[in-house]
Swiss-Prot record:
<dbReference type="InterPro" id="IPR020894">
    <property type="entry name" value="Cadherin_CS"/>
</dbReference>
<dbReference type="GO" id="GO:0005509">
    <property type="term" value="F:calcium ion binding"/>
</dbReference>
<dbReference type="InterPro" id="IPR050174">
    <property type="entry name" value="Protocadherin/Cadherin-CA"/>
</dbReference>
<feature type="domain" description="Cadherin 4">
    <location>
        <begin position="352"/>
        <end position="451"/>
    </location>
</feature>
<feature type="glycosylation site" description="N-linked (GlcNAc...) asparagine">
    <location>
        <position position="169"/>
    </location>
</feature>
<dbReference type="GO" id="GO:0005886">
    <property type="term" value="C:plasma membrane"/>
</dbReference>
<feature type="domain" description="Cadherin 1">
    <location>
        <begin position="35"/>
        <end position="133"/>
    </location>
</feature>
<keyword id="KW-0472">Membrane</keyword>
<protein>
    <recommendedName>
        <fullName>Protocadherin beta-9</fullName>
    </recommendedName>
</protein>
<dbReference type="GO" id="GO:0007155">
    <property type="term" value="P:cell adhesion"/>
</dbReference>
<dbReference type="InterPro" id="IPR015919">
    <property type="entry name" value="Cadherin-like_sf"/>
</dbReference>
<keyword id="KW-0732">Signal</keyword>
<dbReference type="GO" id="GO:0007156">
    <property type="term" value="P:homophilic cell adhesion via plasma membrane adhesion molecules"/>
</dbReference>
<feature type="topological domain" description="Extracellular">
    <location>
        <begin position="27"/>
        <end position="690"/>
    </location>
</feature>
<feature type="domain" description="Cadherin 2">
    <location>
        <begin position="138"/>
        <end position="242"/>
    </location>
</feature>
<feature type="glycosylation site" description="N-linked (GlcNAc...) asparagine">
    <location>
        <position position="567"/>
    </location>
</feature>
<comment type="function">
    <text>Potential calcium-dependent cell-adhesion protein. May be involved in the establishment and maintenance of specific neuronal connections in the brain.</text>
</comment>
Length: 797
């Protein structure tokens, strides 16, 4: 059965080794600086602006920042002055330990264009530590037969300082048996050796006490002391002997605590107590004693705490074997730590932008560095982002990567991206690190306001109250923030005569439209204008829509009676012969209404009458006709009030007053009609025109009557008595009462008229009618027509 290997996306993968190939962006360089340890925070290191050859203020303009390899801010950059300062008090011994020189590596990152400058800071040592012996007392067991010149290696003192400030010399207190000899080691350290100058005699002196002093090279010099107690032993002929001078072994860094690392073994040719060998670390440092422990009887070395290849990859120390007689031997143990894939890759963000403007391709979003503390295949890494996102990774120097936009983004399509940067090593098992970035796409004003309709139709009933809200326009804008805030305005009308500014207004913030004044349907039925919507982006975008306003008619005009004229002058009097048949047309009431539609539909009805049932009014055309045959008992004078009503809601009405005079002969005296009370009415321009027209017609009519009377007077041969006048002959004007032009009055009726002498009121009297002598067939026909009229007409009583 095959086991499939770990797979990764083929795109956007970046494989690199810690031995970087030198891929770099333009402008990369290398700088070396130094600072003394223990300097105060804010101490000056260098002026980067001058060192990089940049003008003042350029560092700030390019967003310069300092990033260290271990992501700790040891340094602080003042981008305005260009000074690089210490961000904390630096302790060389804590930062680097025994390593010399002590170097801190960092990078200087700049944008526009993006550049990386590599740099290093050396922390110079000062003599701030004194030499210290691990043991305040050292015990040496020396046989009394030890030859002169024999050297005994002593434990060296520890001094964290380096270079000239480290231990430079050892001295011994004055005595007659020993002196100090300085010897070096492969690691560059010096060790004190105690050299025997004079043979010891146990019988004379069993013990000696000496003081060992370690001196460093600082100024002033520092020192540390330890007491050496020498025990003089009886003769021990053989010292222990190790099987190997060098024990070399390997230990995986993930070895558990308590694991046996190696076993050393020494033999002694003596017997008894002198052959009993014990093992110990010789001149061991603190890290050896905390990491390993040795069994003094068996020589087995065990792991005391976990190993870390990334901290220490090997240990080399001396093991001492001492017999019971005080003789000793030493061997060297070299422990090599084997790397295991126990460290996931590290992703260190140097700069990050959580927002990017849409329509901006090739923008740097993040700069980060990848580290893997493992080695070999365990330290090789793959870095990638999701395939379905418009972003890519670009490698730079020193394991730096740049996250950039691949193309233009569209906020209206997607306003937020969750980007996951994944770094995986190639070790076994493979370890990975993920870092998520939430990116907000900021808006660019790339969408103009869009109206939901290209045109709007609004309806406003006339006689509205001023400042009435008549409607709204509501465009949408795909942008956000200020780019989506819309301001409304009225555009200049195409009709220059339209007083748009006095008709409507628009709320600039919400698009509400208001009628500024009361509209009159009779003056303005409809008008149109354009509304503009402009956003507050930069540059601003706009659109427009057409608005049509239709004024709805209200029943605000009462009917106006054109005939008979109701203007307060002498009332109109209609003459009706008593011989008139039912349905005889007396007159026609003519009225108009300034409204439209059903508000202008007029109906007529008889509101009041002197004698109900005698006259009727046609409901649809206002014709006043007789409803029955007239009799001698009917009064001669009649007053009719006709109601003219429109079809509005509520309906409006007007009245017309008619005076009807029944005549049947000229012998009857004239009864003066009562004067009509002048009506108070406001005449508009139409009324004036109608009055002028009626006055002209009346003048012509009066002139005709006078001519008619004169002719009749001339023809009469007999003198008239008092109150009487000659009966004229000839036709009576047919248009006297039928102002509507229907011509329905019988032409067979004619009247004699005479003016009374001295009359100041201009009254005229109607006398008896003169009936023409018609042919018999014509009279019968007229009677038949009158009978038909009586039966076929309908009336309102």
């Amino acid at each position: 059965m095959k086991t499939r290997g770990f797979s990764f996306p083929r795109q956007r993968q970046v494989l690199f080794l810690f031995l970087f190939w030198g891929v770099s962006l333009a402008g990369s360089g290398f700088g070396r600086y130094s600072v003394t340890e223990e300097t105060e925070k804010g101490s000056f290191v260098v002026n980067l602006a001058k060192d990089l050859g940049l003008a003042e203020g350029k560092l700030a303009a390019r967003g310069t920042r300092v990033v260290s390899d271990d992501n700790k801010q040891y340094l602080l950059l003042d981008s305005h002055t260009g000074n690089l300062l210490t961000n904390e008090k630096l302790d060389r011994e804590k930062l680097c330990g025994p390593k010399e020189p002590c170097m801190l590596y960092f990078q200087i990152l700049m944008d526009d264009p993006f550049q990386i400058y590599r740099a290093e800071l050396r922390v110079r040592d000062i003599n701030d530590h004194s030499p210290v012996f691990r043991h305040k007392e050292m015990v040496l067991k020396i046989s009394e037969n030890t030859a002169e010149g024999t050297a005994f290696r002593l434990e060296r003192a520890q001094d964290p300082d380096e270079g000239h400030n480290s231990i430079q010399n050892y001295t011994i207190s004055p005595n007659s048996f020993f002196h100090i000899k300085i010897s070096g080691s492969d690691e560059g350290m010096i060790y004190p050796e105690l050299v025997l100058d004079k043979a010891l005699d146990r019988e004379e002196q069993e013990e000696l006490s000496l003081t060992l002093t370690a001196l460093d090279g600082g100024s002033p010099s520092r020192s540390g002391t330890s007491t050496i107690r020498i025990v003089v032993l009886d003769v021990n002929d053989n010292a222990p002997q190790f099987a190997q001078a060098l024990y070399e072994t390997q230990a995986p860094e993930n070895s558990p605590v308590g694991s046996r690392i190696v076993k050393v073994s020494a033999g002694d040719a003596d017997s008894g107590v002198n052959a009993e060998v014990s093992y110990s670390f010789f001149d061991a440092s603190e890290d050896i004693l905390t990491t390993f422990q040795i069994n003094p009887s068996s020589g087995e070395i065990f792991l005391r705490e976990l190993l870390d290849y990334e901290l220490v990859n090997s240990y080399k120390r001396n093991i001492q074997a001492m017999d019971g007689g005080g003789l000793s031997a030493r061997c060297t143990v070299l422990i090599k730590v084997l790397d295991s894939n126990d460290n996931p890759p590290e992703l260190i963000i140097s700069s990050l932008s959580n927002s990017v403007a849409e329509n901006s391709p090739g923008i740097v979003l993040a700069v980060f560095k990848i580290k893997d503390r493992d080695s070999g295949e365990n330290g090789k890494t793959i870095c990638y982002v999701q395939d379905n996102l418009p972003f890519f990774l670009k490698p730079s120097v020193d394991n730096f990567y740049i996250l950039m936009t691949e193309g233009a983004l569209d906020r209206e399509s997607k306003a937020e991206y969750n980007i996951t940067i994944t770094v995986t090593d190639l070790g076994t098992p493979r370890l990975k690190t993920e870092h998520s970035i939430t990116l907000q796409v900021s808006d660019v004003n790339d969408n103009a306001p869009a109206f939901t309709q290209t045109s709007y139709t609004l309806f406003v009933r006339e006689n509205n109250s001023p400042a009435l809200h008549v409607g709204s326009v509501s465009p949408t804008d795909g942008d956000s923030g200020t780019n989506a805030q819309v301001t409304y305005s009225l555009l200049p009308p195409q009709d220059p005569h339209l007083p748009l500014a006095s008709l409507v207004s628009i709320n600039a913030d919400n698009g509400h439209l208001f009628a500024l004044r009361s509209l009159d349907y009779e003056a303005l039925q409809a008008f149109e204008f354009r509304v503009g919507a402009t956003d507050r982006g930069s540059p601003a975008l706009s659109s427009e829509a057409l608005v049509r306003v239709l004024v709805l008619d209200a029943n605000d005009n009462s009917p106006f009676v054109l005939y008979p004229l109701q203007n307060g002058s002498a009332p109109c009097t209609e003459l009706v012969p008593r011989a008139a048949e039912p349905g005889y047309l007396v007159t026609k009431v003519v009225a108009v209404d300034g409204d439209s539609g059903q508000n202008a539909w007029l109906s007529y009805q008889l509101l009041k009458a002197t004698e109900p049932g005698l006259f009727g009014v046609w409901a649809h055309n206002g014709e006043v006709r007789t409803a029955r045959l007239l009799s001698e008992r009917d009064a001669a004078k009649h007053r009719l009030v006709v109601l003219v009503k429109d079809n509005g809601e509520p309906p409006r009405s007007a009245t017309a007053t008619l005076h009807v005079l029944l005549v049947d002969g000229f012998s009857q005296p004239y009864l003066p009609l009562p004067e009509a009370a002048p009506a108070q009415a406001q005449a508009d321009s139409l009324t004036v025109y109608l009055v002028v027209a009626l006055a002209s017609v009346s003048s012509l009519f009066l002139l005709s009557v006078l001519l008619f009377v004169a002719v009749r007077l001339c023809r009469r041969s007999r003198a008239a008595s008092v109150g009487r006048c000659s009966v004229p002959e000839g036709p009576f004007p047919g248009h006297l009462v039928d102002v509507s032009g229907t011509g329905t009055l019988f032409q067979s009726y004619q009247y004699e008229v005479c003016l009374t002498g001295g009359s100041e009121t201009g009254e005229f009297k109607f006398l008896k009618p003169i009936t023409r002598h018609l042919p018999p067939h014509r009279v019968g026909k007229e009677i038949e027509e009158n009978s038909t009229l009586h039966n076929s007409f309908g009336f309102n009583y």
